[in-house]
């Protein structure tokens, strides 16, 4: 029996969203355009999630740039960035319903798709092929978190910056030096020395 086009899109997304698949396949979910998924256009420096709020959605960047960060005193510490086709959400709040300890804000004018947690759960029930969809989305988030830990804990300053440049191509040209430094866990002075050294090597 032939499946509906909408069902096929979800199945395709389910099969593509594996540990080794590139994040661009997450866009397949957006293409389904089911109830509960809506595109939003927001200005630069728009707060999508505030500290203390419960994150009950998953966002996926269509165009633009989003920062996930937490406050340490008066300083903003970057936890992650979401660029085109990347998901963003607070995993602890999304899974456990806890008030968020992070904030989510746009760093550019951004278009993103937002899917409500309950709607996502309903979709998983509606399309039995998607029983593992929820877990796969979380898996992507956990892998990203693990990569962040490895970046901070096991690499020296130069390796951290090089890894960021290689793994997130173009990101460092879109965010400030302050955000780069806080993300890889170095001071701005150290970052300046690294960039100067790399510039000397290139030229």
Q: Where do the PLM segments sit?
A:
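Glycine- and acidic-residue-biased ligand/ion/polar-headgroup-sensing regions
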Residues: 56-67, 85
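Cyclic nucleotide-binding regulatory module and flanking cytosolic helices
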Residues: 1-38
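Phosphate-/nucleic-acid-contacting segments
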Residues: 155-203
């Amino acid at each position: 029996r032939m499946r509906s086009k909408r069902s096929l899109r979800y199945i395709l997304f389910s099969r593509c969203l594996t540990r080794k698949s590139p994040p661009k396949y997450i866009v397949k979910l957006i293409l389904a355009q089911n109830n509960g998924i809506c595109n939003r256009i927001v200005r630069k420096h728009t707060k999508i999630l505030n500290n203390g709020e419960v994150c009950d959605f998953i966002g996926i960047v269509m165009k633009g740039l989003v920062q996930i960060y937490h406050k340490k005193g008066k300083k903003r510490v970057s936890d992650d960035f979401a660029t085109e086709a990347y998901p963003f959400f607070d995993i602890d709040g999304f899974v456990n319903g806890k008030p968020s300890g992070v904030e989510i804000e746009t760093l550019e004018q951004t278009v993103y798709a937002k899917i409500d947690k309950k709607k996502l759960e309903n979709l998983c029930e509606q399309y039995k092929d998607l029983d593992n969809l929820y877990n796969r989305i979380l898996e992507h988030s956990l892998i990203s978190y693990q990569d962040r830990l490895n970046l901070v804990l096991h690499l020296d300053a130069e390796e951290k910056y090089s890894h960021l440049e290689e793994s997130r191509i173009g990101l460092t040209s879109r965010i400030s030096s302050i955000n780069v430094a806080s993300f890889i866990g170095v001071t701005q002075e150290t970052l300046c020395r690294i960039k100067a050294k790399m510039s000397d090597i290139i030229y």
